[in-house]
Amino acid sequence: MKLVSWNVNGVRATLNKGLLDWIEREQADVVCLQETKAREEQVDVIWPEGYAAHWNSAEKPGYSGTLTLTRRKTLSVQRGLGGLLEDKEGRVLTTEFDDFFLVNCYTPNAKRELERLPYRHKEWDPAFLKFLKRLEAKKPVVFCGDLNVAHEPIDLANPKTNERTHGFTWEEREGFSNLVAAGFVDTFRTLHPGLAGQYTWWSQMSNARARNIGWRIDYF
């Protein structure tokens, strides 16, 4: 079974840049997209044959949102955190299959001045972990998406200069550590424990992508 995940930073813009061709090439069983920035009715698209589309869009127009495309039979679809915390931003979308749950997640960004860090640390991260454990009591859980945190120094190019930068604060890293302590596995780091320079996000400034000055903030 093949699962893929991508923060598209706007599904409408990404459709114009070849999203459908990419989906066709990947031939994944399930495609999880984050930061869709659109409602279903705003997107005029015919998805590749065999895929069913499940949306969780933000109430605020053009903001956040998740989308899961699946070719596998889906038993149920759940939006949000099951009542543990209000999700008006379309950040969590859970699809249930015969033998596991798949949780597509776009974790809130703490913001440049860390104004959302208290919410992230005290409310979101604990509620998300509790939600996952509640699901896990029923059947195995796979979760993926943009978690907006580089967990360890190896997961970003410049850890020393970013210790109080959003995405690498001790509070955000602790939230991820709690997921690991609860038994969830960072798949990439488990397979490649010492491999540095592997990132999923680069700033648009200072030619960062060409120089590979990046962060690994997206996970399975």
Predicted regions and their residues:
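Active-site-proximal beta-strand elements of phosphoester/diester hydrolases
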Residues: 1-9, 99-114, 144
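N-terminal, active-site-proximal structural segment of metallo-dependent hydrolase catalytic domains
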Residues: 1-47, 58, 63-64, 178
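Structural motif corresponding to alpha-helix initiation and N-cap regions
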Residues: 16-17, 89, 173
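Short amphipathic alpha-helices and their capping/turn segments at secondary-structure boundaries
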Residues: 20-24, 91-98, 127-139
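Metal-dependent phosphoesterases centered on the DNase I-like endonuclease/exonuclease/phosphatase
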Residues: 30, 50-52, 124-219
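Structured beta-strand-rich core segments of catalytic domains in phosphoester-bond hydrolases
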Residues: 37, 42-112
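Surface-exposed cleft-lining segments at the edges of enzyme active sites
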Residues: 82-83, 108-125, 160-165
